[in-house]
């Protein structure tokens, strides 16, 4: 009765979780005539939803309870996982909890958005990000960051090629706006006072 139907069930996991491996055993999955392709039914959608929910919950558990192991995972699969930020609006909040990045204050350690938000300084009402530079060291040397450094504002340093696309879905975290440093405008008088 139990038979292997397909090797890669792309309809059962979202693209940003394509790194997971496993077996789905269900008597309710309908097949097409060739028995090689799943029919897109409510059952398949329900299975996909449950797999996504369980995988994201397990990743959060690992991130919270075994942060060193999670960072190893992030180094290998973070570029794939963060693609879910603009792709999956329903799971975006959960994916943002798993997101890690280097920052202007932490170029060697990965930081979560939660940590960045919790450590915002007085007067900072936005989480800032900068993309499209190959290394954090290059980014920190940019003149555009001077105003942020003077204010002691942390800036997310996003160096992966896909980050330009990722930030299109990253406009807010936990009711705090996320903006590009190119949108940061500083009052000249304020800078002179410092």
Question: Each predicted region: which residue ranges?
Answer:
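Conserved GHKL (Bergerat-fold) ATPase module
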Residues: 1-194
